[in-house]
Amino acid sequence: MAGRGKRTTDYVRALIPLGFESFQINFWQTLDGIELPRLAAELRPLLDASGTIVSSLAVFGNPLETGEKDMETRRAWEKAIDAAPEFGCDIVCGFTGRVRGKPVSDSIPRLKEVWLPLVERAEARGVRIAFENCPMGGTWESGDWNIAFNPDAWELLFAALPSGRVGLEWEPCHQICQLIDPIPQLREWVSRVFHVHGKDAEIDRHCLATRGISGAKPFCWHRAPGFGQTDWTSIISILRGAGYRGAIDIEGWHDPVYRDELEMTGQVHALRHLQRCRGGEFVLNPVIEA
């Protein structure tokens, strides 16, 4: 994830020599005055020269509510959908939004009101919408940002937005932290996965067994791939076996150990770990003439 506001181009320029192959350009709630076509034009020479890509755009906020920031989030989604092709990508990711403080099911009428026009906008431009599976501290009964964090909610979501252009931005971390096994879940839902975040998790089984999930001590942590408990080789195999041709973009800045001065050490380790799990570098099959 390479969104850094007005410094995004400089940040991508710094990341390219580290070996990153793709970048998600992400925003929090608003575009912060950034003109997306101009940003796309700034990034294009860097991407072309390095053979890297923008995999997706992302807007994280709550487009279902009516506060000033929420309405800016909705406008940012419209602009991101319009601009995605200029970045050479066809995916815009983010949260569904949520009617704050209400159960998941109570958000569905408002979800349809807001998202059906956005889905139509995306369909007209050949763009896909991918909802991240992050609960943002919410539960089924209450929350502030997102309802697309659980398979029960996905069923409601996809029934409300019956378009092949609507899917998931999936990562194992958020499922592990809900005590869900990500491998069988991915097998079931892989056809709906449009984009993947490279983020892992670690469960403290002793804490879970002795203190449960509601104590003062956390029972799980977000980790960079390679430091967590996910079998990324299996995940990549499931994705490839289902025909997935998208990116896995590392979501950093969460690992409790590889942080601060170790942040990029952890992210580059995660990159190399994922590259090994996919089988390393691409190797052409030999061509033997008859």
Predicted regions and their residues:
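Active-site groove signature of glycoside hydrolases
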Residues: A84-S105, R128-W140
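Acidic/histidine-rich catalytic cores of soluble enzymes
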Residues: S22-F23, L57, L116-Q229, E281-L284
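A short, acidic, amphipathic alpha-helical segment used as a generic capping/interface helix at domain edges
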Residues: F227-G241
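Active-site clefts of carbohydrate-active enzymes
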Residues: F219-R223, R245-D260
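N-terminal pre-domain/capping segments
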Residues: M1-D90, D106-L116, E123, A159, ...
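Acidic-and-aromatic substrate-binding clefts and catalytic sites of carbohydrate-active enzymes
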Residues: M1-T8, N26-A40, N62-T73, R98-P103, ...
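Short beta-strand segments at enzyme active-site cores
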Residues: Q24-I25, S55-A58, D90-T96, V127-N133, ...
